[in-house]
């Protein structure tokens, strides 16, 4: 009998202290990241580049001497850019494809601004598998910062390994889409 009273008391306290579902704790406003946030994110990407950050699939290490992948770079740069603001990322860990499908507003090439998202993939596929931060479009070339690991010479040695500043022709088939990061507050 004492055990039954104890169980009922504990359950009652638990139920009273829990949210009964009438309050919506997921309510927030979602917007495109303001231009100044995107520019700050790009500035943090430059710092990663200057720090000789290495590439590592699945990497999202916030400490120096780090390894980071393409989506981790974007996430960390935006997280740093959002410090001391009222904004947050929609989700704290995302793949490039998830950002493309769920955490960005798609824009045209002519709408790109520094710090916007470049969604990329293999030349022979329409799938988004990769992401970079836009810097500028100049003389028919798109300049960006990304994190990658590539053997561009075909010799089995990765001559690109880490956060890089690169550019491709604006018509390169690896470009799949462009976007603005979505944030919430």
Where are the predicted features?
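Short glycine/serine/proline-enriched coil/turn segments at secondary-structure junctions
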Residues: 124-126
């Amino acid at each position: 009998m004492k055990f039954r009273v104890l169980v009922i008391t504990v359950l009652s306290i638990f139920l009273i202290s829990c949210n009964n579902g009438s309050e919506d704790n997921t309510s927030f406003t979602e917007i495109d990241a303001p231009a100044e946030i995107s520019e700050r994110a790009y500035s943090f990407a430059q710092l990663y580049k200057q720090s000789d950050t290495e590439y590592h699939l699945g990497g999202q290490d916030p400490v120096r001497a780090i390894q980071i992948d393409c989506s981790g770079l974007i996430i960390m740069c935006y997280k740093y850019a959002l410090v001391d603001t009222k904004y947050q990322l929609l989700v704290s860990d995302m793949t490039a494809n998830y950002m493309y499908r769920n955490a960005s507003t798609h824009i045209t090439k002519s709408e790109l601004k520094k710090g916007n998202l470049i969604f990329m993939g293999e030349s022979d596929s329409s799938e988004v598998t990769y992401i970079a931060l836009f810097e500028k479009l100049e003389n028919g070339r798109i300049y960006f910062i990304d994190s990658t690991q590539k053997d561009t010479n075909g010799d089995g040695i990765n001559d690109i390994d880490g956060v890089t500043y690169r550019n491709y022709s604006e018509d390169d088939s690896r470009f799949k889409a462009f976007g603005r990061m979505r944030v919430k507050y």
